[in-house]
Regions:
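A solvent-exposed, acidic/Ser-Thr-rich amphipathic alpha-helical stretch
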Residues: 3, 18-74
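Hydrophobic pocket/interface hotspot
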Residues: 12, 24-25, 32, 45, ...
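Short beta-strand segments enriched in hydrophobic/aromatic residues
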Residues: 28, 83-85, 114
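Short, cysteine-centered beta-strand-loop-beta hairpins and adjacent loop/turn segments enriched
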Residues: 59, 84-93
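Short, surface-exposed coil-to-beta transition loops
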Residues: 64-65, 92-98
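A short hydrophobic beta-strand element
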Residues: 74-83
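Low-complexity, intrinsically disordered terminal/linker segments enriched in charged
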Residues: 111-132
Length: 132
């Protein structure tokens, strides 16, 4: 297990917990990529990634992540969590997984997978047979 990756995972989670976007972005490489699978096209580069994160925090200012497990590997970590946020006055919760590639002690890529059908059900939206 890489101590460097483990420390990054801890600090990254702490920065997200307090919505410190500057601290989050300081842990990303210049050519970082963020992909919210099923939600948007990948954001490539520091500026685009920051914009994507800022948009999420603006849409869900009370977003919280309760970590369930973190798996540390060589050059990556995987974070399993429960996300909660308020959308149009409704509290929504769903499971999520982040797969984070690390290069030089910083986040090179963040792939986020959320339980979109659970979010859609809680918002009263129809779910497709493919995403269910």
């Amino acid at each position: 297990m890489s101590v460097e990756v483990q420390e990054l995972a801890v600090h990254y989670g702490e920065a997200w917990a307090v919505h410190d976007l500057d601290a989050v972005m300081a842990m990303h490489t210049d050519d970082t990529v963020f992909h919210l699978h099923g939600g948007a096209e990948p954001a490539s580069g520091r500026d685009a990634t920051r914009e994507a994160f800022a948009a999420a925090l603006a849409q869900w200012p009370d977003i919280r992540f309760e970590r369930k497990r973190v798996h540390i590997g060589e050059g990556h970590f995987v974070s399993e969590y429960e996300m909660s946020a308020t959308s149009d006055g409704h509290l929504i919760t769903c499971d999520g997984v982040d797969v984070i590639a690390v290069d030089g002690g910083r986040v090179a890529r963040k792939d986020t997978y959320l339980d979109w059908p659970a979010i859609q059900r809680q918002l009263g939206e129809p779910t497709s047979a493919i995403s269910a």
